[in-house]
């Protein structure tokens, strides 16, 4: 499983953003081209290995949207997008996030206390976005049933788990070594 995803990751270019090694990939960046076969592999993996006994799928703008869309179409479960701009709706929750290469505000709408959710994201790397979103979800008092990242880079998973006490799982684990993506394993190999 995940053979197309793994192959595409190994072939992904790596660019430097300051001291941060940033791999450029369709699932994490939307470029150069998001092919349906890889997106389907991702949706199949999350629906197979994730706990889908939820009311809502939650994703973060922008690169979680295509993952949540594919997953929603596959499962029939609606999704909520954590957005980068405020809509000023009643109950909107603002979240400050800081990653290895940016920082800013995120806004959560459409969730209520007691909602059972799965949080899906493209990548967990520095943990900044996921930590901020998980803390906000806890404050809203949703039931965080599962957290799945398509890609786990470096120690991001451990950083998030240490900061939030929430278990994070990923489909594929990788590191960037000497400017190249190296696959370290996948959830179906565990």
From Swiss-Prot:
Gene Ontology molecular function terms on file: guanine phosphoribosyltransferase activity; hypoxanthine phosphoribosyltransferase activity
GO biological process per UniProt: IMP salvage; purine ribonucleoside salvage
Principal subcellular localisation of the protein: cytoplasm
Catalytic reaction equation(s): IMP + diphosphate = hypoxanthine + 5-phospho-alpha-D-ribose 1-diphosphate; GMP + diphosphate = guanine + 5-phospho-alpha-D-ribose 1-diphosphate
InterPro entries in the record: HGPRTase-like, PRibTrfase_dom, PRTase-like, Pur/Pyrimidine_PRTase
Annotated localization: Cytoplasm
Pathway assigned to this chain's UniProt record: Purine metabolism; IMP biosynthesis via salvage pathway; IMP from hypoxanthine: step 1/1
EC number(s) recorded for this UniProt protein: 2.4.2.8
Gene Ontology terms: cellular component: cytoplasm
Keywords: Cytoplasm, Glycosyltransferase, Purine salvage, Transferase
SUPFAM superfamilies per UniProt: PRTase-like
Top class in the EC scheme: transferase
CDD domains referenced in this protein's UniProt entry, alphabetically: PRTases_typeI
HAMAP family reported in the protein's UniProt record: Hypx_phosphoribosyltr
Quaternary context: Homodimer.
Purpose: Catalyzes a salvage reaction resulting in the formation of IMP that is energically less costly than de novo synthesis.
UniProt name for this protein: Hypoxanthine/guanine phosphoribosyltransferase
Lineage, top ranks: Archaea, Methanobacteriati, Methanobacteriota, Methanomada group, Methanobacteria
